[in-house]
């Protein structure tokens, strides 16, 4: 289940997000979409990086019946990247969600041997989405 908090004026749909989440976990996920200023504040407070970023994940402590964690997505990145890559806002939203969800599930593309990239590619293909965040970042 997705607990969706859209703090922006973007018209985003979570049907595909719900399907992606339920294909990978049965735990609740908090999903927040916010503006670049709040994202910068969150990034600064939790990572000591004083700039906005596209997506952040915050896993919760593993306990029975506890939610998996929170994913925060920056609306500006959704808008800019969807225009840059020529796909819909909802496609970009889904790509960022997948990236954040995989981090909640323990994947880390900065240290793994390509497992996160492979899993991202599998999910993207399954849900017929455009090119992945990791592939774009490596290009």
Swiss-Prot record:
Principal cellular location given in the protein's record: cytoplasm
Enzyme class: hydrolase
GO cellular component: cytoplasm
EC number: 3.1.-.-
Alphabetized InterPro entries for the sequence: MetalPrtase_cat_dom_sf_prd, YbeY, YbeY_CS
GO molecular function: metalloendopeptidase activity; RNA endonuclease activity; zinc ion binding
Alphabetical keyword list: Cytoplasm, Endonuclease, Hydrolase, Metal-binding, Nuclease, Ribosome biogenesis, rRNA processing, Zinc
GO biological process: rRNA processing
Cofactors (names): Zn(2+)
Keyword rRNA processing recorded: yes
Compartments where located: Cytoplasm
Signal peptide interval: none
Cysteine pairs bridged by disulfides in the record: none
Cofactor: record remark: Binds 1 zinc ion.
Residue numbers binding Zn(2+): 99, 103, 109
Family assignment from sequence similarity: Belongs to the endoribonuclease YbeY family.
Function per UniProt: Single strand-specific metallo-endoribonuclease involved in late-stage 70S ribosome quality control and in maturation of the 3' terminus of the 16S rRNA.
Name under which the protein is recorded: Endoribonuclease YbeY
Organism (species): Sulfurimonas denitrificans (strain ATCC 33889 / DSM 1251)
């Amino acid at each position: 289940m997705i607990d969706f908090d859209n703090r922006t004026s973007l018209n985003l749909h979570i049907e595909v997000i719900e399907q992606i989440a339920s294909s990978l976990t049965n735990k609740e996920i908090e999903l927040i979409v916010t503006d670049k200023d709040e994202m910068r504040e969150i990034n600064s407070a939790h990572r000591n990086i004083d700039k906005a970023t596209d997506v952040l994940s915050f896993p919760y402590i593993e306990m029975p019946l506890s939610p998996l964690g929170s994913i925060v997505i920056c609306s500006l990145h959704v808008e800019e990247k969807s225009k840059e890559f020529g796909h819909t806002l909802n496609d970009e939203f889904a790509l960022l969600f997948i990236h954040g969800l995989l981090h909640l599930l323990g994947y880390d593309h900065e240290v793994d041997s390509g497992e996160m990239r492979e899993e991202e590619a599998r999910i993207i293909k399954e849900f017929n989405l455009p090119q992945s965040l990791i592939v774009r970042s490596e290009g």
